[in-house]
Amino acid sequence: MFTSDLIIIGSGPGGYRAADYAARCGLSVTIIESKHAGGTCLNTGCIPTKALAHDAKLHQRSWTEAINRKNEVVSQLIKGVETLLSQKQITFVHGQAKFKDAHTVVVNEALYTARNIIIATGSQPAIPPIKGAQSDTVITSDQLLSLTELPRSLCIIGAGVIGMEFASILNRFKCKVTVIESLKECLNTIDNDIAKRVRKQMERRGIEFYLSCNVKRITGNSIFFEDKKGAEQCVNAEKILIATGRRPNLSGLDLEKTDIDFTPKGIVVNENMQTTKPHIFAIGDCNGRQLLAHAATFQGFRAVNTIVGKADKINQNIMPAAVFTEPETACVGLTLQAAEEQGINAQEVKGFYRTNGRALAIEADEGMVKLVINENDLIIGCHAYGTHAADIVQEVTCLMNLSATRSQLSDIVHIHPTVSEVLQDLAR
């Protein structure tokens, strides 16, 4: 039996960053991975999609060339993670972990035990119960990233983050893209006005949207759906991408042997990422809280801090997010509507890229920024659409963590010319 201070199951951003941090805190760590180091983010998520989005924007590589470059980027970063996990206090084990009891896991018939365990197994594409969804023409986001030949046409079921990013990417590679969404608007988790602007811009590029529509069945290359009037419609495509969400990777772990609470939506945890067994933690997608790589990372930091008895000031309620369409959109905090629904007296101020010198100079004048301010002048939300939107929102994330006010933002000198001046201007 191999004993260490901490076992981590999963080596995505949550797992490998937690392993590195725990080692630096003096703990001996065993990290177990059933597939490839880096998890979904590095292998089939954040990084490969951003590599493809970059090539899509430049129009300099074919799809096949872009896929090859994506693979090179992923391989390089995997080596970096493997190097990080090769340090003295970390033992990397490749294989499927199964719990024997609340302190012990079995991997390749060997036993590993630890005082504390962090589950960081991530998630996988969720396939809805649509008749014909197992057809050869139907693919997941994981499979799309392995296609060496660009399909002539693609129908995407789902207009969330994954669906919209792939719609934007494949459209730039001259693939005919159709998106079917059951809700009234795309990107239902962000500001509705900005979501509408994203969709309208993509429609101008030739992407076709069917909103408030429910897919009923898939037959070969045909997708049959019911439109908002109740009439049956049909769309044909060479490939069909299911992008209707993700579900936690919990099968095969034998979690029942730990007596921790979990549901199909994820493992139940408290604010310190502890399960109902306080020495077992769950971070990232597998707890179903926030399906974001950076959320997993900071949940991992919180878990390790709890283990070593260190207090931190990580505010998990201020969690920025971005959608890397072209142009991108990003957000943090509350929308005005959400603030009002919570009984918060708030106002919204807007700034537009079309008045920004840098945006005009680089031909990126389509965009806007919204700040949500409460009655005490505190910034409680920011929602941006346009080039460098994620960077703008990151600035506001810093301000919100410092409980900054709109008037304080107005006094911060911003570099000229930058798109970030939109923030400074709307604060005045």
Predicted regions and their residues:
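Core beta-strand elements of the Rossmann-like FAD/NAD(P) dinucleotide-binding domain
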Residues: 2-4, 108-116, 230-239, 276
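Beta1-alpha1 glycine-rich phosphate/pyrophosphate-binding loop at the start
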Residues: 4-6, 11-76, 169-189, 315-317, ...
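N-terminal Rossmann-like dinucleotide/flavin-binding domain of flavoprotein oxidoreductases
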Residues: 2-4, 41-111, 189-213, 220-221, ...
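Beta1/beta-strand and adjacent pyrophosphate-binding region of the FAD-binding site
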Residues: 1-12, 150-160
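Glycine-rich dinucleotide-binding loop and its adjacent helix/turn
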Residues: 46, 121-176, 180, 208-209, ...
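Flexible, glycine-rich terminal cap/loop adjacent to redox cofactors
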Residues: 7-14, 18-35, 40, 47, ...
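Rossmann-like dinucleotide-binding cores of NAD(P)H-dependent redox enzymes
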Residues: 72-78, 82, 145-146, 151-155, ...
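FAD-site-proximal beta/loop scaffold in flavoenzymes
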Residues: 134-150, 234-307
